[in-house]
Every structure is written in C-alpha cells, then in structure tokens.
C-alpha cells in the first residue's frame, strides 16, 4: 500500500513548486531583458562589434525575436550596412505588420536614401498599427515639411517667383534644422 503525505504537506509542496517556477520565470525574463539593455547600451556607446556579437547570440536561440532584430538593424545601419538594415526591417514589417517601430525605422532609412514616397508609405503603416505613435507622426510631419521646402524653393527659382514662396521656404528651413 502507498502512503500519501498529508494534505497540508502536499499543498505546501505545490506552493513551493509554484514559487520555484515563478522564480525561474522571473529570472529568465530579467536575463532576457538584460540582453536587450546590454545591446542597447553597446549601441549607444558605439561598440557595434560587441553589440553585433550579443545580438547574433540571441538571434541564434530566438531567430524570430522582433525586438532583437530591430536592434540588429540599428547595429547594421551604424556599421554603414544600410542595405542590410533595410532588409532586416522589410522582413520585420512583413512578419510583424502590427508593430509600428520597424515601419518607422524603415521610413527613416528610406528617407535617408531619398526614397520619400516609400518613407511616407512606411510611416502611414506605422500609424495604422498605432495611430498615436508620436515618433512616426513627427517623422511624417518632418517629411512633409521637407517636401514643402523643396517645392517652395523650386517656386522661388522660377522666372515669375512670388515673394511668398521665398518667405515660406525661409520659414520652413529652420524647422528642419532642429
């Protein structure tokens, strides 16, 4: 015949097991958060090789991790590998269209490449994902200001250039310097 521990002992053991599982989960999550913090810090400090090594290590164990892939794109861009960074972000936007950050970051790279139409489309997708995403709203405003500046400058260079076009260009230019 088997004997079972008293009910109190069983519930105490169960509680200890639950606490142990919760503790392990907390440790795993905090360790994972530390990886992101470490990579972010390395990027901020310009230590792109070390950041790349840590992001590669994380992506080997979790290749679809969107947060680390976003950080990876920043590393690649900082290393002058903008084409690869664009590829990472384009892939992220296809796999995770609900995340606004990859759309926004992709728009920044597109704008830097002179692909204004693509940048605007990407920012609009970011805003579809999260309409109150202020970074994307500001970036979209900056793109439109830049386009307005170009148009006013062109208008100011025509033979019958209205003075208002030059005034508007002069008013917009300092806004884009900030």
Residue map of PLM features:
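Helix-start (N-cap) detector for alpha-helical repeat units in TPR-like alpha-solenoids
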Residues: 32, 66-67, 100-101, 134, ...
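Terminal, low-structured helical/coil segments at or just beyond the last alpha-helical repeat
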Residues: 142-178
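Structural marker of alpha-solenoid helical repeat scaffolds
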Residues: 61, 94-96, 129, 158
